[in-house]
Design a protein with these regions (language model features):
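Non-heme Fe(II)/2-oxoglutarate
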Residues: 1-99
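Catalytic core of non-heme Fe(II) oxygenases with the double-stranded beta-helix
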Residues: 93-208
Length: 209
């Protein structure tokens, strides 16, 4: 793994604040992997979404690689399996396990690309409302030039208290799914990110059971 002292800092931030913000040079992705991910996300077919998976108000274009309605299902397109091969390579999986402080087996449950254009946003929500077994959301920033679009994470016990993260190109956010959050309105440019959710449960989505 990369600089262990720095990774410990990320792990501590995740534990204390519910989110680790990781600069590009410290993510587990190689330059080649990052370029391939960008290509897949750029080319995947997208749909406009106004209501999110946690029933939150949205205004976002979404490209899907894996869905999690009743159970995790890989979307049939040219890119899903290639993307999964990258995301679940051994070093990336172990990196995420380290940050979220678990030795348990973890699984991919949902993977999507979120394209947020000017005046668009992702509303306030809890990821565990989509699936109560979600452990962490991992957000890889692919957008370069945009204003606004802050990743805002709220204190679990006080909605008036929050931390804003301005994600730089190539950065990775790993966020505890028990913390409410939103993406504020993009005021200029286009914000694009790959979002994938991990869980200790590979089976049926308990939201629907």
């Amino acid at each position: 793994m990369k600089n262990s002292e720095t990774l410990e800092k990320f792990k501590k931030n995740y534990d204390l604040n519910g989110t680790a913000y990781i600069e590009k040079d410290f993510t587990p992705f190689s330059d080649d992997q990052f370029l391939k991910i960008s290509e897949y996300c750029n080319n995947v077919e997208k749909e406009f979404v106004e209501v999110g998976d946690a029933d939150e108000p949205n205004h976002v274009h979404v490209g899907r690689f894996m869905t999690d309605i009743k159970k995790p299902e890989i979307v049939d397109n040219l890119y899903s399996n290639k993307l999964i091969d990258i995301l679940w390579s051994k070093n990336i999986k172990s990196y995420i396990q380290f940050i979220v402080n678990t030795n348990d087996e973890i699984y991919l449950r949902r993977i999507q690309y979120n394209q947020i254009n000017k005046d668009c946003f992702v509303g306030y929500h809890l990821d565990i409302d989509s699936n109560p077994d979600y452990l962490a959301a991992c957000v890889l920033q692919l957008g370069k030039n945009f204003d606004g679009g802050l990743y805002r994470v709220y204190n679990k016990n006080n909605k008036k208290s929050f931390i804003d993260y301005k994600p730089d190109y190539g950065s990775l956010l790993i966020s505890d799914c028990q913390y409410p959050h939103e993406v504020t309105k993009v005021t200029d440019g286009e914000r694009g990110s790959l979002v994938f959710f991990v869980s200790k449960n590979p089976d049926l989505n308990k939201r629907n059971n």
